[in-house]
């Protein structure tokens, strides 16, 4: 018999406390719902979102060339990811106050509208604006899919179902790259975005029919769309966050006044903190719920997302420019990382479901392993590219092995390095989501899952943009130095028109515009610019390993003491 004193806790631990009767009733109802119709309704939209992301990664260089605005191609990727970042956490809160179905239909509307407008873009600016509208919806498609899975599954089941979800997501990424290549070289990229509109309309019909999840904390239908209820959505926090991230991107890529941009960025960040701390009633970033473990895992998530999206958007440009590989064949290179995302998600879900150790500690060990794989993949990729000359030359890795640009060996190593980065990312993603379900109250899971996707999206937009900006800035300065400042041993004289043609239209590089020896040296400048773009990613991956190791040790001590 247990002895009690005045310090004894008479209440059961939070995970053992009984839920209110109605909440428990709704929970049992949701668990009993037929899963396939719900998951199909959710995952079809998620599939489209993932398809869209790799389509753009593969075709953005060609689209920018078509508009003769290659120097702006980072905005094709960034505009979509920026709005995705800003609105994703709002969908978590929106689904908590209006229900999962209403939030999902809102996301589907913006995604379809963005795809439709993309078809009619006449320049990179219009293309980017349309992609931004599409990103508003895409953020919700992914976030609500993950949130709704937690409603109809137990915590341990969620790891497996999240693995299935990432298989669907990975399959979309797998098809996106080759489809983008085939379409842009046959019927054009406009049709590729146009055919997504009727598909997302079908998703809306399925959502209306199948998404019937009941939630205890959602107000009655007549109260959901009142001004008082909708005012709970933290729109000012979201807008100030967009302003902060946009300021960072403009600081890195714009020729505007750096002082004013820096002041704008700092001011926006201060406004965001003040709104989240003192103004917003229900925050997109609830500081009071941010435990040390969640903060560490969030930081690692940002880093991992930065690394993988930097790779996704750098890889096609490298293959197309330096190795002269077509858009269609570039898509084949991107298939393997997409497969690794699906496999990594499934394996992680299986491990978490069958582990005998503390579930949270197991999840954090997987996060640590995922970061190690990403650093190894980046290091291998950097080593390969630093020794592999563009397109035609010979590189002796070992005395018995010779690489040529048309050799299968460098391609296998390149794919393996990309697979390591993507596999590690998938493991980290599933493990972090499961740790949220295991450590957060049911009523806050939608919000905290939205916060998780906020961190992931911040990593996505910064990784894609800053990696491309690092490459573009390095290329601009190095080309200028080579063409006009460096003393060369040849007699060739460059013109500024040639310089700006290379910067604004990357197809100019492969045209008959330079003598062979000059062309070779220009390619070497491009190669050095690509290598420089690896450095921030490698440094961040190393930081991620340190943080995830601390996370493992922290949870191990906590689980041992308990």
Curated annotation (Swiss-Prot):
Residues 1-30, 122-131, 188-190, 254-255, 314-331, 387-419, 470-528 are vacuolar. The chain crosses the membrane at residues 31-51, 101-121, 132-152, 167-187, 191-211, 233-253, 256-276, 293-313, 332-352, 366-386, 420-440, 449-469, 529-549. One of its GO terms (cellular component) is fungal-type vacuole membrane. Residues 52-100, 153-166, 212-232, 277-292, 353-365, 441-448, 550-562 are cytoplasmic. Belongs to the major facilitator superfamily. The gene is VBA1. InterPro entries: MFS, MFS_dom, MFS_trans_sf. Keywords: Amino-acid transport, Glycoprotein, Membrane, Transmembrane, Transmembrane helix, Transport, Vacuole. Glycans are attached at residues 123, 324, 504. Its main location: membrane. This is Vacuolar basic amino acid transporter 1. GO terms for biological process: basic amino acid transport; transmembrane transport. It is a multi-pass membrane protein. The keyword Lyase does not apply. It is found in: Vacuole membrane. Transporter required for vacuolar uptake of at least histidine and lysine. One of its GO terms (molecular function) is basic amino acid transmembrane transporter activity.
